[in-house]
Amino acid sequence: LGDVYKRQGPCFKGGAKPITIKVSDFDRAAPHGTGHIKAGLNYAMSLHAIVTAHAEGFDENMYLDAATRTKVEETGGANFIFVTKDNKVVTPKSNSILPSITRRSLMYVAEHYLGLEVEEREVYFDEVKDFAECGLCGTAAVISPVGKINDHGKEICFPSGMDEMGPITKKLYDTLTGIQMGRIEAPEGWIK
């Protein structure tokens, strides 16, 4: 899976508060483009959209696939993780999504440490309302809980996560940061 190095401390002082994101009208990556590559251009493509989102009071954008605008992809700098009502951990699969070591690590933790079922598959936007939890994952924050998604005025609120991290998201966060901080034994080869 790659190397994970010890963190010096928590990213959020006092805990992570759920964020509110909006469905973007912009596209982050073109079909068959370079969305899966960590390149400056991919971040630059989302700058106008994030400035617009912040001006409208949102923390981040949700990008849908550029070809059909029906499938969840990612934000400008983080991958999505969803939790179903029966505690299955789901993450979107697309050739336009930047592969994330944090996402892979969280999926490994979910399956091998927490005993949860995991799926990497296409996630259709229409099914997002049925998930119990939503989070954004990336290197700095590990997981930022999403409490609400605004789709052009229609709100999707996650029953677990409006006031704090949902229970599965919290277990994922605590377990991965426990591994990073040396409180929980790491898988072979994760920590040097």
How would you name each of these model-derived features?
Residues 1-5:
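Short, small-residue-biased leader/transition segments that mark boundaries at the very start
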Residues 6-192:
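Helix-start/capping segments and mature chain N-termini
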